Amino acid sequence: MDSRVWLPLIGAHLLPRDISVITQMIANNNNTSISRSSTNSSKPEEKNSKKFLIERFLDDDPSPPASILSPSPKAAIPSPIINPAVEFVNGGYGVKNPLAPLISSFETTSIPCSTVSPSSLISSSKDEFQDSLTCHICGKKFGLQRLLNRHIKCHSDLKRYLCTFCGKGFNDTFDLKRHTRTHTGVRPYKCEQCEKSFTQRCSLESHLRKVHGVTHQYAYKERRSKVFVCEDCGYTDEKFEVYLSHIKVVHPFSAAYLRFTQLQKKNSSMKPEQLSKISL
């Protein structure tokens, strides 16, 4: 039988090797049906129709090739798969370095847990205390222990967080987020005076002050209100519930939403506001 007759009845999503297999099987079924019709002429004439041949082909072969049942690989749409061994950060555009435990061991062996004993803090002056908070690698001084701890991470060759676009490493999620936005083009902070937008809020504030003469209500180094940013499209909102509703509806398969749902299952007693502190 001509393939132009039966191919539309089966479907167009077939590979060339599948067509040759089907052609051979239909040819065999055609010969079988002719021999049966000669032995039993009382059967209806429509039994030799094209539809009957296709039905016989499907009935006689209980296990057709897998490529027939499944669509062509070119037509298949891959579903999002997240490796459980990899922990995503920054909305899925960064991952935690699997070698992060080695980084922690490096810091504990390279940095003393306490550079100054409590007794010496009482007797020593403020200048002596500030001198003690000095990076032993580059000599930079800090006023707070947490600032020294944060600075010392930049000297490590192993980075805690890796960019999923280029593999560049960072030890701070803020630096990772600022970097990945150069790949995605997300500029969530938009100027209301003009059409410019920026990847960081500090850049927007600097633009408003220098270009438009807008003074800010925040003091120097005063903490700003939290803004939740969708790293997929740049949508922003100050309320986590609204932000969560956005990624649930617009980006239901994003790594950010999948990470939140996983944390919600593990911490069912926690409220969404509490989960927002550990999911982002």
From Swiss-Prot:
Coiled coil: none annotated. PROSITE patterns: ZINC_FINGER_C2H2_1, ZINC_FINGER_C2H2_2. Keywords: Metal-binding, Nucleus, Repeat, Zinc, Zinc-finger. It holds the Pfam family zf-C2H2. A zinc finger (C2H2-type) spans 133-155, 161-183, 189-212, 228-251. Its main location: nucleus. It is found in: Nucleus. Changing residue 179 to R: In sa469; defects in hindgut development. Produces ectopic spicule cells. Defects in the development of U, F and K' hindgut cells. Morphological defects in excretory duct cells. GO terms for biological process: animal organ morphogenesis; epidermal cell differentiation; hindgut morphogenesis; nematode male tail tip morphogenesis; regulation of DNA-templated transcription; regulation of transcription by RNA polymerase II; response to salt stress. GO terms for cellular component: nucleus. The keyword Manganese does not apply. Transcription factor. Involved in development of the hindgut, the male tail, and the excretory duct cell. Involved in modulating function of excretory duct cells. Plays a role in left/right patterning of cell fates in the hindgut. Differences in the regulation of lin-48 expression may explain, at least in part, differences in excretory duct morphology and function between C.elegans and the related species C.briggsae. This is Transcription factor ovo-like homolog lin-48. It comes from Caenorhabditis elegans. The lineage of its organism: Eukaryota, Metazoa, Ecdysozoa, Nematoda, Chromadorea.
